[in-house]
Swiss-Prot record:
This is 5'-nucleotidase SurE. Binds 1 divalent metal cation per subunit. Belongs to the SurE nucleotidase family. Its EC number is 3.1.3.5. It comes from Clostridium botulinum (strain Kyoto / Type A2). The gene is surE.
Length: 252
């Protein structure tokens, strides 16, 4: 397949380069990624500034470009200008840290994959759990991403699908399997700590602790139980459960 590879951690991040090195052995890969760290960019795009595109050399045989914009910009620029006609799949990652539960809404990694689907290109986001002061398991995540890709044929891929793949932090032997599941609730209970600086301004810092109230059968639940999770996503945000009720409430 012809793969467009992007991320939100930046073009020099270990995750995307580990994945690129493995995928390029079996597929044609073009890397288009932010020049700098752009985590938690969500689906933001660059409007008021020009976007700078630079070709980057990589040690493996792929084309690579850095983009001065956001993860979503990377996909837009790639599919509009750099490789507009021959991409079979967009893969975003490997992200440093999970993208499960409500965190999906903030994720530049997932949003880049969603942007691919909005261009009618099947897409997958790949994220690996990160534990502070421990070495990331990108090679395990890359193997699972390649395995998912190899199970798919071009004719199997719906052009508006986004697959969200997350890999827990543990040895490969400890992984219990793969669960296809729904999105869970929040991972963390977040809050702002407050300090006062020398000029009397409030200085707020985001902090939090792990949310222990999780729902069984969700990505958050299975990751905590050492399963790889795969969740199909879609960019249509319509709440169909109350669509008719809303019509009756406001238009009847």
């Amino acid at each position: 397949m012809n793969i467009l590879l992007t991320n939100d951690d930046g073009i020099e991040a270990e995750g995307i380069n580990t994945l690129a090195e493995l995928l390029s052995k079996y597929h044609d890969v073009t890397m288009v990624a932010p020049e700098n760290q752009r985590s938690a960019s969500s689906h933001s795009i660059t409007i008021y500034e020009p976007i700078i595109v630079k070709q980057v050399k990589k040690p493996y045989n792929i084309e690579a470009y850095s983009i001065s914009g956001t993860p979503a910009d990377c996909v837009r620029v790639a599919l509009d200008k750099l490789v507009p006609d021959n991409i079979d799949m967009v893969i975003s990652g490997i992200n440093k840290g999970l993208n499960i539960g409500n965190d999906i809404l903030y994720s530049g990694t997932v949003s880049a994959a969603i942007e691919g689907a909005m261009y009618k290109v099947p897409s997958m986001a790949v994220s690996a759990q990160f534990i502070k002061n421990k070495k990331e398991n990108y090679k395990i995540a890359a193997k699972y991403a390649l395995g998912m890709l190899n199970r798919l044929k071009k004719e199997d891929l719906k052009n508006d699908v986004v697959l969200n793949l997350n890999i827990p932090f543990c040895s490969e032997e400890e992984i219990k399997g793969i669960k296809v599941c729904k999105v869970g609730n929040k991972i963390f209970n977040t809050r702002f700590s407050e300090e006062i600086d020398e000029e009397g301004n409030k200085v707020l810092k985001l902090e939090g602790d792990i949310n222990k109230d999780i729902y069984e059968g969700t990505d958050v639940y299975y990751i905590r139980n050492k399963y790889v999770t795969l969740t199909p996503l879609h960019y249509d945000l319509t709440n169909f459960n109350i669509l008719e009720e809303t019509e009756q409430l406001f238009l009847s």
